[in-house]
Curated annotation (Swiss-Prot):
3',5'-cyclic AMP 1 binds at E278, R287. It holds the Pfam family RIIa. This is cAMP-dependent protein kinase regulatory subunit. InterPro entries: cAMP-dep_PK_reg_su-like, cAMP_dep_PK_reg_su, cAMP_dep_PK_reg_su_I/II_a/b, cNMP-bd_CS, cNMP-bd_dom, cNMP-bd_dom_sf, RmlC-like_jellyroll. Residues 28-212 are annotated as: Dimerization and phosphorylation. The gene is PKAR. Residues 75-84 have a biased composition (Polar residues). The lineage of its organism: Eukaryota, Fungi, Dikarya, Ascomycota, Saccharomycotina. It comes from Debaryomyces hansenii (strain ATCC 36239 / CBS 767 / BCRC 21394 / JCM 1990 / NBRC 0083 / IGC 2968). Residues 95-106 have a biased composition (Basic and acidic residues).
Amino acid sequence: MTDNQYATEELNQLQKELVAKNPIDVLQFCANYFNSKLELQRSQLWQQQNKAKAAGINLFPSIDNVFNSDGGAIMTTNKRQPSFKSPFGDNDPTSIDHHHDDDPKEAPGASKQQNKAELFKGGFGVGKSTPSKPLQELDPNDPSHSASQDTDAAPPVPKSKIPVAFNANRRTSVSAEAMNPNKFKSDSWKPPINDLTAAQKVELSKTLGSNFLFRQLDVSSKKTVIEALGKKEFKNGDEIIKQGDEGDYFYIIEKGTVDFYVNGNQVNSSGEGSSFGELALMYNSPRAATAVAASDTGVTCWALDRQTFRRILLERTFNRRLMYEDFLKDVKVLSSLSSQERSKLADALSTEIYHKGDKIVKEGEQGENFYFIESGSCQVSKDGKGVLTKLSKGDYFGEVALLNDLPRQATVEALDTVIVATLGKSGFSRLLGPAVDILKSQDPTANQGSSN
């Protein structure tokens, strides 16, 4: 399988996962997806380490064994955690420099012979056109490796710069370009504003509402996206995007049909209201397919530029995380969560607004969400028992139906304008962690005093 085919297969699989899971935080979901794929691949390679060594193949070019001062006993500090050659180490300012100032530039007597059958090489040095050299391994039979009798001298260890949280020895995959959300409020960036009719804005709003990337945008962000969309016309047979090119626009089809080709073979077609081109913008990866206008009368698309696309999605995610992290700190039932767990929970929450008299949950209905009250007040009532209690900011409801897979045990009604943060059933047990046990211990079902 070629690199392009491999990338296309990975991106197609990711697209299926995105459609199936419909995550609130798309960026976090995709990062977790590729991290889990990497972890699985590395685990499989590690299991083949002994067989590979027997065949003369070095899956992990590294220095696994460093001899102690006796020259015979092997130090096992890195035996299970081999030191990997970083493809970015020479130019990465975040690298950790694993050497002492008085270390020699090279390990004395280090073998000059390169591995003959390396599967993975660090040849992606940033800012360089020449591949970086693989790590040299110490020759255990070389007497020059014996440490000096001087106890002040440290054993010779080659320099190895490893970026923080770097996973080495695999092909590089998609990666998002660096953007710092903290600078958003201080820079001078302004989104483009195009002259659209009221009818066009309404139609585009409907289209964005059905797209998983923009579904959770607030009113202001959605307005910015709509006004930034520019109309582009293509004749029959025109290439809208080309496989392997850098992504510059995200497209929504207004009129006509677009055919998609991978390595010259047609793989799909899309019509009015469909969108394409988002993955290359999100992850700074090459276009996975070629899109060709396939209507005799031409194709009309709405296009969103790369910077606005990434800026809106990233800024929104960043601001939501900050807002929800502050809010979740004040929710007592979540006090057992770590800051990292709260951050993950914050990314999964979505906001819903209800007005006075609205029924947020109804007794007898199937429960699908767990709710935290951000602002406003609600009353909890049950058939035959009337109003049971009132809830306000920081209170929660909806847990009983999810904990016990039961219908809603009560009705929750908004007493004024209420803003709630919601968490779906799939994320309830996955993200609440130890808080689930606390919720179970407080389950009011047995006492018939349930609030949901």
